[in-house]
């Protein structure tokens, strides 16, 4: 469970950062 959650975070973080840095 936690493994998949960390995977989702790892996938979501880059997109969030790119949105903030836009």
Swiss-Prot record:
GO biological process assignments: defense response to Gram-negative bacterium; defense response to Gram-positive bacterium; killing of cells of another organism
Keyword terms, alphabetized: Amidation, Antibiotic, Antimicrobial, Secreted
Keyword Translocase: no
Tissue: Expressed by the skin glands.
Primary location: secreted
Localisation per UniProt entry: Secreted
Cellular-component GO terms for this entry: extracellular region
Modified sites of kind Lysine amide: 22
Family, as annotated: Belongs to the frog skin active peptide (FSAP) family. Brevinin subfamily.
Functional note: Antimicrobial peptide. Active against Gram-negative bacterium E.coli (MIC=12.5 uM) and against Gram-positive bacterium S.aureus (MIC=12.5 uM).
The protein's name in its UniProt record: Brevinin-1OKa
Protein species of origin: Nidirana okinavana
């Amino acid at each position: 469970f936690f493994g998949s959650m960390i995977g989702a975070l790892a996938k979501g973080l880059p997109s969030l950062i790119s949105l903030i840095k836009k």
